[in-house]
C-alpha cells in the first residue's frame, strides 16, 4: 500500500471513530492532575499507563524525586527512525473558579469547541498523539517508525526533575527526532 493510501486509511479510521475518541478525551479531561497541589497526579499517571499498554505500547511509570514520568515505547520497526514525543499530564490549578463558564473538570462543548482545564495545555495534545498511534496500529498493525512517549507530571511547576531524569535515563530516550506538543 502506498504511503498516501496508508495514511488515508488511518484518517478514515479516525473519522469513523471521531465521536468515540471525543468521548474518551472528555473522560480523560475529567481527571484532575494538578501538580502544584499534588491532586490526581498518581491517578492520571496510572491511567496513562493503562491506556498506553492497552493500545500495545510497552509502558511504565518511572518514579522521580517528585511526580512520576510515564514512558511508553513501541520499538518494532528495525532500521527505522525513532521519534520521541514529549508532553505533560499535569495542569495548572483552575482558580479562580468563578471565572469559569463551566466547571474546569467537567468538559463542555460550546459553539463547537471543547472547554476544560488541560484541553489546550497539554492533555489534549498528547491524547491526540496517543489516538493517532492507536489508530495507525489498528489499521495497519505496525507503525512506520519507532515511537517513545515521555509524559511528565511536573511541567506546570517548572519541570524540576526532568533534567535529572533525562540524564539518568538517556538509554530510555534515545531518538532520532524529538517533538514537543
Predicted regions and their residues:
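Acidic/His- and Gly-rich active-site-bordering loop/insert found
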Residues: 2-119, 136-144
Amino acid at each position: 500500500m502506498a504511503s498516501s493510501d496508508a495514511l488515508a486509511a488511518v484518517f478514515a479510521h479516525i473519522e469513523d471513530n471521531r465521536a468515540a475518541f471525543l468521548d474518551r478525551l472528555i473522560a480523560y479531561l475529567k481527571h484532575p492532575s494538578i501538580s502544584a497541589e499534588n491532586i490526581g497526579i498518581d491517578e492520571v499517571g496510572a491511567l496513562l499507563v493503562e491506556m498506553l499498554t492497552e493500545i500495545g505500547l510497552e509502558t511504565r511509570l518511572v518514579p522521580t524525586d517528585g511526580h512520576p514520568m510515564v514512558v511508553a515505547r513501541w520499538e518494532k520497526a528495525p532500521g527505522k527512525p525513532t521519534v520521541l514525543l514529549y508532553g505533560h499530564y499535569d495542569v495548572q490549578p483552575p482558580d479562580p473558579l468563578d471565572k469559569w463558564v463551566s466547571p474546569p473538570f467537567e468538559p463542555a462543548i460550546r459553539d463547537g469547541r471543547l472547554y476544560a482545564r488541560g484541553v489546550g495545555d497539554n492533555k489534549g495534545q498528547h491524547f491526540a498523539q496517543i489516538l493517532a498511534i492507536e489508530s495507525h496500529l489498528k489499521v495497519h498493525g505496525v507503525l512506520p517508525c519507532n515511537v517513545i512517549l515521555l509524559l511528565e507530571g511536573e511541567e506546570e511547576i517548572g519541570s524540576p526533575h526532568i533534567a535529572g531524569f533525562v540524564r539518568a535515563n538517556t538509554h530510555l530516550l534515545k531518538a532520532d527526532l524529538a517533538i514537543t506538543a
